[in-house]
């Protein structure tokens, strides 16, 4: 096999070695696989634990330990249980797994064989036997890598060269266990997922359960967010070294099997076949603070572009501090940075079109009525069903990044903006290890989130500005869509995930999770029993949070929770009879109808003092109630300037002036007429 052959040479120059002065400085094995079409697995090198000083052989699933080939670098014979091991030869010595002592002269090495059981396996080998160049620069694309991918049955899904391997991620790139992007030499189906070239290897270093992303992606797909990335947990080996449990996912990209919309980037490139877009000078607003400059864009001067530039666009909400690192994008007039993932190098016309479209949508969402100054409703710009579903994912998961970063939207040609694909939940579901988290399942998250310090000079008004999910809750029709989706769709998907699917994930991953915990020293112990107990405790944090979250949303995610509001009622003049001024009753931005949506009752509304108005919902608003008050004044009372808008206070002032004028005229007439009365 191509990968296996290269693995041996990689081991020789860059495997996992003991100190070079050690009598046994390297040790590696290769086991036969049990799959129908696989004859050998990749090479696995030993790894030394700083916790107990032992060397671990983390073996992939489907390993036949009864037929292991060993390779080593030693100064003398290598003995195990009184039997000499032959370099490059097969042995049955390790058939039952467990702990063994290797000896070279007087030096002894304890080697522990651990076995994954049900996960697919990926072996990658780099041409120089290391990852130093990638780790020094995550954007560096390593060429000449090879990959062997074995599915959960041990059969080969891919055995060929990679086009490239590089680093990925923002905060996750700073962890010891690194995430990567790989690009295959040709499209392939990996582990039952749809055929593609580009894939992501997520490390999930901060997620001790290793399952947060997988759980939430599964629910996203179940509720109908069709662009949700498919994913599988795998064991990853690079140059023979076990890297732990990774989550291989479909990349967020425009592709027939990913985000299936018109590829504007490809169409633009086709019209400029000899142009390297990355060499073009950047235009617009760039630099360190460009992500904080409202109503700005960044683009490239591209000679030719398609006639139709209405799509497709793949966009991501991003932090202002990260925005300068991206090629193209725009910042809305309310300081929301939006980067273009595709087209990565956008023309000025493309940026002006999509930023203008987004701005009109934002204006409509920010308005009290849901309509912008052009008279267009926000639902004319964004697909409200995907918008509601993505909100529910962000809310239910307790995602700290909700509406801040890793939130994607896309727009097809002549279509509306759609929400998705969902992405990046390793810090969700009460992951206190990640630093930023929502730990209380009984509080709102996405519904109340604001923009994240995106303004220049720490503009506090921006920090208090609702982000895109919170904006939806200004509008009754959005809340109704969310409520309907929760009751008829999301709740059942969440229950199914928590009550059935998670058990399947655990069964598949638990053995590998123990290996991963030892490899990355999660619990400062190598005891399998202690690690298993700790792992299940960490997993319980996730399931307890999501279960409580489900209960909280089931009780509170309803339009009735938003309440009714009654318009300000100006002070009224005493007439001696009941005073029943006209009122406007709303639920969010929806004006309700008396007798259909509510009943109204007045009390203490005859004599001078404070009258009370009570509105009781009916029909769709049954169970909702609101109260307000207004003042009843005598003519001689001073004007009341409290409450209401400036316009309402002006009207009240005029009404009071009119009332006093009429009363004054009546008083004068009374004294003129009085002498003639007998």
Q: What are the language-model segments listed below?
A:
Residues 1-19, 657-678:
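Gram-positive cell-envelope targeting signals
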Residues 11-119, 559-646, 650-652, 656:
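Beta-rich interaction/scaffold domains
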Residues 96-98, 109-156:
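N-terminal module-boundary/linker segments of secreted carbohydrate-active enzymes
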Residues 143-203, 347-353:
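Conserved oxyanion/phosphate-binding beta-strand-loop segments in alpha/beta enzyme cores
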Residues 175, 336-422, 426-560, 643-650, ...:
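Middle-to-C-terminal accessory/interaction subdomains
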Residues 188-189, 203, 224-229, 241-392:
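Internal "kinase-insert"/substrate-recognition segments embedded within catalytic cores
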Residues 223-235, 399:
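Short, well-structured beta-strand/strand-turn elements
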């Amino acid at each position: 096999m191509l990968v296996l052959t290269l693995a041996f040479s990689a081991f020789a120059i860059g495997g996992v070695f003991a100190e070079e002065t050690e009598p046994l400085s390297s040790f590696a094995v290769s086991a036969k696989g049990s799959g129908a079409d696989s004859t050998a697995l990749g090479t696995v090198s030993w790894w030394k634990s700083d916790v107990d000083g032992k060397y671990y052989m983390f073996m992939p699933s489907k390993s036949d330990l009864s037929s292991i080939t060993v390779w080593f670098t030693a100064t003398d014979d290598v003995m195990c249980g009184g039997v000499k091991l032959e370099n490059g030869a097969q042995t049955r010595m390790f058939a039952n797994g467990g702990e063994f002592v290797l000896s070279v002269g007087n030096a002894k090495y304890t080697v522990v064989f651990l076995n994954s059981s049900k996960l697919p396996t990926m072996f990658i080998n780099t041409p120089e036997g290391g990852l130093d160049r990638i780790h020094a620069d995550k954007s560096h694309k390593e060429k000449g890598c090879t990959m062997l991918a074995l599915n959960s049955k041990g059969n080969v899904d891919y055995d060929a060269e990679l086009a490239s391997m590089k680093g990925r991620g923002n905060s996750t790139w700073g962890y010891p266990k690194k995430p990567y992007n790989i690009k295959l030499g040709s499209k392939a189906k990996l582990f039952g997922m749809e055929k593609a070239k580009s894939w992501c290897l997520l490390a999930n270093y901060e997620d001790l359960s290793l399952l947060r992303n997988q759980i939430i992606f599964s629910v996203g797909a179940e509720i109908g967010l069709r662009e949700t990335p498919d994913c599988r947990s795998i064991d990853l080996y690079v140059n023979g070294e076990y890297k732990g449990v990774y989550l291989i996912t479909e990349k967020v990209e425009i592709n027939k099997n990913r985000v299936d919309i018109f590829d504007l980037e490809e169409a633009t490139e086709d019209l400029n076949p000899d142009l390297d877009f990355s060499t073009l000078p950047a235009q617009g607003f760039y630099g360190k603070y460009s992500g904080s400059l409202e109503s700005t864009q960044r683009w490239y001067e591209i000679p030719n572009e398609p006639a139709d530039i209405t799509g497709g666009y793949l966009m991501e909400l991003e932090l202002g501090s990260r925005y300068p690192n991206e090629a193209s994008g725009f910042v809305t007039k309310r300081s929301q940075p939006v980067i273009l993932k595709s087209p990565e190098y956008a023309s000025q016309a493309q940026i002006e079109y999509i930023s203008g479209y987004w701005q009109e949508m934002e204006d409509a969402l920010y308005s009290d009525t849901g309509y912008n100054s052009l008279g267009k409703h926000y639902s004319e710009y964004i697909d409200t069903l995907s918008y509601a579903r993505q909100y529910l994912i962000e809310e239910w998961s307790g995602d700290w990044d909700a509406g801040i970063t890793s939130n994607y939207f896309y727009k097809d040609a002549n279509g509306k903006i759609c929400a998705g694909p969902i992405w990046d939940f390793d810090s969700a579901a009460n992951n206190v290890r990640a630093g930023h988290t929502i730990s209380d399942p009984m509080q709102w998250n996405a519904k109340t989130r604001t923009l994240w310090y995106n303004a220049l000079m720490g503009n506090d008004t921006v920090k208090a500005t609702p982000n895109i999910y919170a904006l939806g809750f200004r509008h009754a029709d959005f809340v109704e869509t969310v409520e309907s989706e929760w009751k008829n769709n999301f709740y059942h998907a969440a229950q199914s995930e928590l009550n059935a699917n998670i058990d399947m994930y655990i069964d598949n991953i638990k053995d590998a999770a123990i290996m991963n915990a030892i490899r990355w020293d999660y619990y400062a112990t190598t005891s399998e029993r202690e690690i298993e107990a700790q792992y299940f405790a960490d997993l319980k944090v996730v399931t307890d949070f999501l279960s409580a979250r489900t209960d909280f949303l089931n009780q509170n995610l309803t339009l009735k929770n938003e309440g009714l509001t009654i318009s300000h009622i100006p002070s009224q003049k005493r007439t001696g009879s009941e005073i029943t001024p006209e009122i406007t009753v709303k639920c969010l931005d929806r004006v309700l109808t008396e007798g259909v949506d509510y009943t109204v009752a007045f009390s203490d509304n005859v004599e001078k003092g404070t009258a009370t108005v009570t509105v009781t919902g009916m029909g769709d608003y049954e169970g909702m109630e609101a109260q307000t008050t207004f003042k009843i004044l005598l003519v001689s009372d001073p004007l009341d300037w409290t409450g209401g808008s400036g316009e309402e206070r002006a009207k009240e002032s005029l009404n009071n002036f009119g009332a006093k004028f009429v009363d004054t005229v009546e008083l004068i007439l009374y004294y003129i007429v009085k002498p003639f009365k007998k």
